[in-house]
């Protein structure tokens, strides 16, 4: 395993990048295909650690699938309903929040005895609000270590009914319930307490659920109404669009050191909220050209921005790097949920930005960033967080190089990132 990657100063970027499949969509449709009636052909599936954890879990749960040699096409034979297991099993899900959270709800639909576990960081990522919601619906769930965190064991028993869910920590909790509750024995009404974070990710979930034949109604994202005793049905074939969060690094590179860079796989017809990043780039001064399935960015002078970025928390990390190349002080607001991601991203971003000379103020839920007078060559700690590694690769566009520690952490979502980044770069 590579301990570090030294990126030399890059003088210019130009070219086209074909994006890998979206992580958020890949793991959602793998699960939906598994519990749907019929066989689904998934194309442009993301090949990464997170999707592999989901595939391994589904196989252990009895799902049959055929994965192509390049791991981008998968034929999934749906079981037509909840998972029924006659014996106790354990599922290891690494640090894949997009796997452990939706699986917990679906596995709570039927009498089971299933342990869901993960790596050390997963044991620090909260899941208590989701567990509380499932218990309200009749589920029997036990914490095996620390209350509110994995590992956890579900014994099943979820029926539905009225559920109150905190919405201010992670949208994945609601996504989990929205996927599982149509299969419950009773109708379910979900009442959201507080402000729902990352609403665009809920839109992804609702869109995909509809493609698999189920409609869910909601009242301005405050109350969700789900009919029980439904069945998901295969759409036959589904092509996963490119990962919009991953697009942000290449578009940002063009804004900083272009040339022009075109990303394919996302565009005007994307269902992912993170394409909003391109609009933010435009507000900062870059030139953006949209097509149905591509976005092109061309360099221009960048100005600082002050925005609430709760709706695009992943792509907001790239804005923190753009701040270093912009005139003025950039403020990224309402991003408390950075603290419960792969690492505490607010703290990690602050520490690493200061290493390279930036002036940073870290608040409970915001970052204020002013560019450095001089960029300093640094070794960047990635905290085993794929997005930290990809974000800080852009420091190589500053005129100084950068050393990325534990670069292999990108395997969580984008194993070929550095190869693709260097393919558009000129030293």
Curated annotation (Swiss-Prot):
Molecular function (Gene Ontology), one example: 3-phosphoshikimate 1-carboxyvinyltransferase activity
Keywords: Amino-acid biosynthesis, Aromatic amino acid biosynthesis, Cytoplasm, Transferase
Family annotation (Gene3D superfamilies): Enolpyruvate transferase domain
Binding site for phosphoenolpyruvate: 23, 97, 125, 172, 345, 387, 412
Chief place of localization: cytoplasm
EC number: 2.5.1.19
Catalytic class of the enzyme: transferase
Example of a GO cellular component annotation carried by this entry: cytoplasm
Reactions this protein catalyses: 3-phosphoshikimate + phosphoenolpyruvate = 5-O-(1-carboxyvinyl)-3-phosphoshikimate + phosphate
One of the protein's GO biological processes: amino acid biosynthetic process
Positions that bind 3-phosphoshikimate: 23-24, 28, 170-172, 198, 314, 337, 341
Stored PROSITE patterns: EPSP_SYNTHASE_1, EPSP_SYNTHASE_2
Pathway noted in the entry: Metabolic intermediate biosynthesis; chorismate biosynthesis; chorismate from D-erythrose 4-phosphate and phosphoenolpyruvate: step 6/7
Biological role: Catalyzes the transfer of the enolpyruvyl moiety of phosphoenolpyruvate (PEP) to the 5-hydroxyl of shikimate-3-phosphate (S3P) to produce enolpyruvyl shikimate-3-phosphate and inorganic phosphate.
Family: Belongs to the EPSP synthase family.
Subunit structure, interactors included: Monomer.
Name used for this protein in its record: 3-phosphoshikimate 1-carboxyvinyltransferase
Organism per entry: Buchnera aphidicola subsp. Acyrthosiphon pisum (strain Tuc7)
């Amino acid at each position: 395993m590579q301990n570090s990657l030294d990126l030399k100063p890059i003088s210019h970027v130009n070219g086209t990048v074909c994006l890998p499949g979206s992580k958020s969509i890949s793991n959602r449709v793998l699960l939906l295909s598994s519990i749907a009636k019929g066989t689904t052909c998934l194309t442009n599936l993301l090949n990464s650690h997170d999707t592999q954890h989901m595939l391994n879990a589904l196989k252990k749960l009895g799902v049959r699938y055929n994965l192509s040699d390049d791991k981008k096409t998968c034929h999934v034979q749906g079981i037509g309903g909840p998972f029924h297991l006659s014996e106790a099993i354990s599922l290891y899900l690494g640090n894949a929040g997009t796997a452990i959270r939706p699986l917990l709800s679906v596995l709570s639909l039927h009498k089971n005895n299933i342990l869901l576990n993960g790596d050390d960081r997963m044991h620090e990522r909260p899941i208590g609000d989701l567990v509380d919601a499932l218990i309200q619906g009749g589920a029997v769930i036990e914490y095996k270590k620390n209350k509110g965190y994995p590992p956890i064991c579900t014994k099943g028993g979820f029926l539905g009914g009225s559920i109150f869910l905190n919405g201010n920590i992670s949208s994945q909790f609601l996504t989990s319930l929205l996927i599982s509750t149509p299969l419950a024995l009773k109708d379910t009404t979900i009442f959201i307490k507080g402000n729902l974070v990352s609403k665009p990710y809920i839109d992804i979930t609702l869109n995909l659920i509809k493609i698999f034949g189920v409609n869910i109604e909601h009242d301005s994202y405050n109350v969700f109404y789900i009919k029980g005793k439904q069945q998901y049905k295969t759409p036959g074939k589904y092509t996963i669009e490119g990962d919009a969060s991953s697009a942000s690094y290449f578009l940002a590179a063009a804004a900083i050191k272009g040339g022009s860079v075109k990303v394919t796989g996302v565009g005007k017809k994307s269902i992912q909220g993170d394409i909003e990043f391109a609009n933010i780039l435009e507000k900062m001064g870059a030139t953006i050209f949209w097509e149905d399935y591509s976005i092109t960015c061309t360099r221009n002078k960048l100005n600082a921005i002050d925005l609430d970025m709760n709706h695009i928390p992943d792509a907001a990390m790239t804005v923190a790097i753009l701040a270093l190349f912009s005139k003025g002080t950039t403020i990224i607001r309402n991003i408390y949920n950075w603290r419960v991601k792969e690492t505490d991203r607010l703290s990690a971003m602050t520490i690493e930005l200061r290493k390279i000379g930036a002036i940073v103020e870290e608040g409970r839920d915001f970052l204020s960033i002013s560019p450095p007078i001089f960029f300093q060559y640094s070794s960047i700690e990635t905290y085993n967080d794929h997005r930290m590694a990809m974000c800080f690769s852009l420091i190589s566009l500053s005129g100084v190089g950068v050393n990325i520690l534990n670069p292999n952490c990108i395997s969580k979502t984008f194993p070929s990132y550095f190869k693709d980044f260097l393919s558009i770069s000129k030293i």
